[in-house]
Swiss-Prot record:
Protein name: Splicing factor ESS-2 homolog
GO BP of this protein: mRNA splicing, via spliceosome; nervous system development
UniProt feature, compositional bias: Polar residues: 126-151
Modified residues (Phosphoserine): S409, S411
Region annotated Disordered, chain positions: 1-20, 105-163, 425-471
Native species: Drosophila melanogaster (Fruit fly)
Biased composition (Low complexity): 1-18, 105-115
Compartments where located: Nucleus
GO cellular component terms, semicolon-separated: catalytic step 2 spliceosome; nucleus
Record family assignment: Belongs to the ESS2 family.
Lineage top rank: taxon: Eukaryota
Keywords: Nucleus, Phosphoprotein
Length: 501
C-alpha cells in the first residue's frame, strides 16, 4: 500500500480556498477605504425663465390689471365714449354701446339687452364673448376672485393663459425674468466673484478654519495614532468669521425648530379686496336694510316703538310745534360782517398753550430788499431788451450806417478807444479852410468831382488831390491837407527794440 504525499497549496495559487479568502479580504479593505459619509441632498435652485423685455412687461401688466385694477377696461371704455361724444362721433358711440352694453351672461340677474340704458357710459361693463365668457371678470364677482385676462386673438389668448392665467404676481416674478434683469444679475455675480478674488485672504481663511476644526474632530487611523501629533489638529474654542462681533453688528439668536416651523407656515399673500374700493350700490343697500331693521326697535330720541294693534301702528298725538326737535334747513337774520381775508398779524392765536403754526409778516428790511431787487431786475431787463433791439436792427438793416451810428453802437470801452486813442470824434468833423497866404486860388468849375463822404475806419485815406476835368482844359488843382490825414495808417507790425536804433 503506497502512501501519496500531498503538497500544501500556496496562497498565490489561483483557485485555492486561501487565495479566494485573501481576494475577498482585499476587496473588503478597498471598499472600507473608499467609504464616504453620505452628504445631504442638494436642492437645485430653479432658474427663472428668461423672457424678452416686451413680453415680460406685457404679461406683468396683464396680471396687475387683472388682480389690482379690474375696472380699468370699463374706465377706458367710458373715456372713449366721452371723447366720441365731445367730437359728436355717433358711429364710434354706437360701436361702443354695442360692444359694452349688449353682451351679458345669463344667470346674473341682468337682461341681455339693455338698449334703453345704453346711452349712459356708467353702465359699461367688460365686453363678454361666448368663447371667453369664463375668463372675463364678472361685475358681481367677489373681490377675492381672480379673473383671467383676455386677448384679442386665439393664439395670444392661449399663450397668455399658459403664462399668466394661474399665476399671481409673486409667482410670476419667481418663475420668469426679463433679459435686462438677468444681465444685471450676472453683473452682480461677476462683481462679487471679483471682490472675493481680490480679498481672497479674508474669505478663504474662514473656509480653512472650518476645515481645520473638522480635521481636529476626526479620529485618526490606527497607523497614525502612534506618530507625531499633527500641529494643525488643535481645537479652537472660537470660530473664525470675517464679520466679527467687534467690528460689525452681531448676529441675532438662531431660530428654534418651533419658530422655523411657524415661519414656514406663514406664507405671504395679498388680499386683493383691500386694494380697491367697495361697490357703493351694495353698501347703500346694506345700509338701507340695516336702517330699516333698526327703526322699529328704536324710535326718535331712543324711545321704544309703539305697539301694534291688528298689524297697525298707533299714531302719536301731533305736536303744536312740529319742527322744534330738528335743526332748521334755512334761517334768517342779519350778517354781522362781510367776510375778508385774514392777514398774518390778524390770525387768531390758539387758546391752548401747545405749539401752533403761524406765518410771520415780512420785515421792513426784507420788503425794501425785495423792492430794490425788483427795480434792478427791471432795469437789467430794459437794458437787455434795448441791446437786443439794437443788435437786431444792425443785423437786419441793409443800409450803410454813419460814423455816429457806428460809434453809438459800440461798447463804452470801444467808444473810449475810438475817441481817445484813434482820435475819432463823435461830432461831424470841421474841415479847415486854407488861409489866403497858402498858395494859389482854387478855381471851382462845374466839372469838379469831389467825394464828401467820410472814409470808413480801417481804410487808408488817399491824398487830397482831385483832378478837375473840364470840357475845354485838364487842370489839376491842389485842395490842400486836413488834420485827419494819415490818421488811420496804423502799423500792422509791432515795432521791436531794434527799430529805434
Amino acid at each position: 500500500m503506497s502512501a501519496t504525499t500531498r503538497t500544501p497549496a500556496t496562497p498565490g495559487t489561483p483557485g485555492t480556498p486561501g487565495s479566494l479568502a485573501m481576494e475577498v479580504a482585499r476587496v473588503q479593505n478597498s471598499a472600507l477605504a473608499e467609504f464616504k459619509k453620505p452628504t445631504a441632498m442638494v436642492r437645485h435652485k430653479n432658474k427663472p425663465k428668461i423672457l424678452t423685455e416686451e413680453k415680460y412687461i406685457e404679461e406683468m401688466s396683464k396680471i396687475i390689471q387683472r388682480d389690482f385694477f379690474p375696472d380699468l377696461e370699463r374706465l377706458r371704455a367710458q373715456n372713449d365714449y366721452l371723447d366720441a361724444e365731445s367730437r359728436r362721433d355717433f358711429v364710434q358711440m354706437a360701436e361702443i354701446r354695442e360692444r359694452y352694453s349688449l353682451g351679458r351672461i345669463s344667470g346674473t340677474g341682468r337682461s341681455t339687452s339693455r338698449r334703453n340704458n345704453a346711452m349712459s357710459p356708467a353702465t359699461f361693463e367688460t365686453p363678454v364673448s361666448q368663447a371667453k365668457c369664463s375668463n372675463t371678470p364678472l361685475p358681481n364677482s367677489r373681490a377675492t376672485d381672480t379673473p383671467f385676462s383676455t386677448d384679442g386673438s386665439e393664439k395670444s389668448d392661449a399663450e397668455g393663459r399658459d403664462t399668466t392665467a394661474k399665476l399671481s404676481l409673486d409667482a410670476f416674478l419667481q418663475k420668469y425674468t426679463s433679459e435686462d434683469n438677468q444681465s444685471f444679475q450676472e453683473i452682480i455675480e461677476t462683481a462679487e466673484a471679483k471682490l472675493r478674488q481680490k480679498y481672497a485672504v479674508l474669505y478663504n481663511h474662514e473656509k480653512l478654519s472650518a476645515e481645520q476644526l473638522q480635521r481636529a474632530l476626526m479620529l485618526p487611523s490606527i497607523e497614525t495614532q502612534f506618530e507625531e501629533p499633527d500641529p494643525l489638529r488643535k481645537i479652537e474654542t472660537w470660530n473664525y468669521t470675517n464679520m466679527n462681533s467687534i467690528m460689525y453688528v452681531p448676529d441675532g439668536v438662531e431660530y428654534t425648530e418651533e419658530e422655523r416651523v411657524q415661519l414656514a407656515e406663514r406664507k405671504q399673500s395679498i388680499q386683493h379686496n383691500a386694494t380697491r374700493l367697495p361697490d357703493e350700490a351694495k353698501h347703500r343697500e346694506m345700509d338701507t336694510k340695516k336702517l330699516n331693521d333698526e327703526v322699529p326697535q328704536n324710535g326718535a330720541g331712543g324711545a321704544t316703538a309703539t305697539p301694534k294693534v291688528r298689524g297697525f301702528d298707533l299714531l302719536r298725538s301731533p305736536s303744536p310745534r312740529p319742527g322744534e326737535a330738528f335743526s332748521p334747513i334755512m334761517t334768517w337774520g342779519e350778517i354781522d360782517g362781510t367776510p375778508f381775508r385774514l392777514d398774518g398779524g390778524d390770525t387768531p392765536l390758539r387758546p391752548t398753550q401747545g405749539p401752533s403754526f403761524r406765518i410771520n409778516e415780512n420785515s421792513r428790511r426784507e420788503n425794501i430788499a425785495i423792492a430794490l431787487a425788483e427795480r434792478v431786475s427791471e432795469r437789467m431787463r430794459n437794458q437787455k431788451q434795448m441791446a437786443l433791439d439794437t443788435a437786431r436792427r444792425n443785423i437786419g438793416s441793409p443800409l450803410i450806417r454813419t460814423n455816429m451810428e457806428r460809434l453809438a453802437s459800440m461798447s463804452p470801452a470801444a467808444q473810449l478807444l475810438a475817441t481817445g486813442k484813434l482820435g475819432i470824434r463823435g461830432t461831424p468833423r470841421l474841415r479847415h479852410t486854407p488861409s489866403p497866404m497858402s498858395g494859389r486860388k482854387r478855381k471851382v468849375t462845374p466839372g469838379v468831382v469831389r467825394s464828401t463822404n467820410t472814409p470808413i475806419l480801417g481804410e487808408p485815406k488817399p491824398k487830397q488831390q482831385a483832378k478837375i476835368s473840364t470840357p475845354a482844359k485838364n487842370v489839376t488843382i491842389d485842395t490842400g491837407s486836413t488834420l485827419t490825414d494819415d490818421l488811420l495808417k496804423i502799423p500792422t507790425k509791432r515795432r521791436t527794440a531794434a527799430d529805434f536804433f
